[in-house]
């Protein structure tokens, strides 16, 4: 049962800390270095994640990226108060610009070093499309996370709107997840019948501010809902997150 609690917030935290956007890749020879700090919570778990990442466009059609997050979490379970910290699921990604507005992506997620992380390797892949207007960008995407069936195997799709104003961008994103969780064998050999719901969604809103020609600050908030996250039997509420990311553009 406690594994179920952990994986609900792990899934939310992993998605919330995907730092890169859904618009076309950067120009050849350019890139970004990112440093992020955020707070995620889903009772009875809460904590802070710090992450460092980099992405670089080696070619006009190829972008390479990496993200390494560290988690500092605490939770209360069966009368015990536990603190955990360590490496969460590191991510390595490739993105291919196949035509104007269309790109393919493949990401690999490595196992983490603490209990609050996915404990198996997972691969994520999909298609992105974006329309660029004078002051509005509209992005759409569809993808599939291929990992352990009980924790992180699902289809997802979503859309993002970015509105460009003077020296800053306001954006909003909606992501829908669809996938079936399987019954899981708990520790001690007992079969758990807590087959979870299949659907969930994530809603995020944020602002990107150009501090200088090379520094951009991104402040965001995310909320998760649906039976993939919420579970009344386990007394799980809706997860939420707040974060701030500083980008160095080169």
Segments predicted by a language model, with ranges:
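Hydrophobic alpha-helical segments and helix pairs
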Residues: 81-128
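Transmembrane beta-strands of outer-membrane beta-barrel pores
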Residues: 37-43, 68-74, 108-114, 121, ...
């Amino acid at each position: 049962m406690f594994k179920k609690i952990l994986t609900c917030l792990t899934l939310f935290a992993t998605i919330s800390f995907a730092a890169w956007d859904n618009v076309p890749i950067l120009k050849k020879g350019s890139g970004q270095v990112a440093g992020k700090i955020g707070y995620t919570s889903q009772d009875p778990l809460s904590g802070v994640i710090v992450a460092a990442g980099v992405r670089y466009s080696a070619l006009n059609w190829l972008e390479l990226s990496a993200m390494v997050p560290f988690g500092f979490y605490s939770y209360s379970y069966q009368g015990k108060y536990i603190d955990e910290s360590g490496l969460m699921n590191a991510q390595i990604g490739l993105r291919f610009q196949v035509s104007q507005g269309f790109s393919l992506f493949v990401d690999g997620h490595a196992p983490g070093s603490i209990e609050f992380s996915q404990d198996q390797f997972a691969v994520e892949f999909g298609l992105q499309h974006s329309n660029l207007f004078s002051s509005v960008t509209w992005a759409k995407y569809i993808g599939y996370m291929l990992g352990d069936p009980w924790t992180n195997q699902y289809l997802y799709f979503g859309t993002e709107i970015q509105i460009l104003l003077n020296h800053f961008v306001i954006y909003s994103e909606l992501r829908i997840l669809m996938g079936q969780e399987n019954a899981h064998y708990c520790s001690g050999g007992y079969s758990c019948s807590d087959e979870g719901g299949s659907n969930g969604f994530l809603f995020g809103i944020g602002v990107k501010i150009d501090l200088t020609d090379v520094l951009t600050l991104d402040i965001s908030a995310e909320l998760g809902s649906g039976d993939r996250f919420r579970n009344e039997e386990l007394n799980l509420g809706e997860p939420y997150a707040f974060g701030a990311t500083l980008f160095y553009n080169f």
